[in-house]
Amino acid sequence: MAAAVAGMLRGGLLPQAGRLPTLQTVRYGSKAVTRHRRVMHFQRQKLMAVTEYIPPKPAIHPSCLPSPPSPPQEEIGLIRLLRREIAAVFQDNRMIAVCQNVALSAEDKLLMRHQLRKHKILMKVFPNQVLKPFLEDSKYQNLLPLFVGHNMLLVSEEPKVKEMVRILRTVPFLPLLGGCIDDTILSRQGFINYSKLPSLPLVQGELVGGLTCLTAQTHSLLQHQPLQLTTLLDQYIREQREKDSVMSANGKPDPDTVPDS
């Protein structure tokens, strides 16, 4: 009987070759959960805790170590151009003043630039990331503390300090920090004291006058002794002539005179 039932199922329920079954059974039930991590055995936990690697503490804290050097960056053409311009400014100008570049209006900046240009004083602005490396490698490295934030350079071929200070006084919110004149570093007070000095033609005139006076005094001192000697000789000759005339008039020698041997 079992064989007959199996034959009926094989013949009637099983699908024939090349045909899909009209009825398909689906299994419903619990599935294996693989999302949860399997708990480690307690003996293995003990073994892992005992054999855990403990790295040695460093002798110096990593925060105290110097940062690794950054890779050198390739210079672009603009930086090379600015560096050459900065080198030309410091080489061709005797006066270099450093000011704080405050937020001036375009009209005020243009007016001040025009007033400075009348006295052949030029206004230059360079980025600090290009200017500071140049100063570090030059003889002007003591000017580095002045370059904090946005700065402005006032340069001229001749030291026109008096004119520059007079123009900057009209702009009180543009502070003068310092600078250098003829490779001599000056502070703000040094620039003000320099502006109070007399002009070069006046000093040259005073120097020429002093030298002329000294020359005249030297000339008079050199002429004093010869003139005095000449006067004494003239007086001596005149006295001798008077004595000779007295002797010739009396016909006998003067008793005061002593004859030559």
Swiss-Prot record:
Major place of residence: mitochondrion
The protein, known as: Large ribosomal subunit protein uL10m
Entry-linked SUPFAM superfamilies: Ribosomal protein L10-like
Organism (species): Homo sapiens (Human)
InterPro entries: Ribosomal_uL10, Ribosomal_uL10-like_sf, Ribosomal_uL10_bac_type
Transit peptide boundaries: 1-28
One Gene Ontology cellular component: mitochondrion
GO molecular function annotations of the record: RNA binding; structural constituent of ribosome
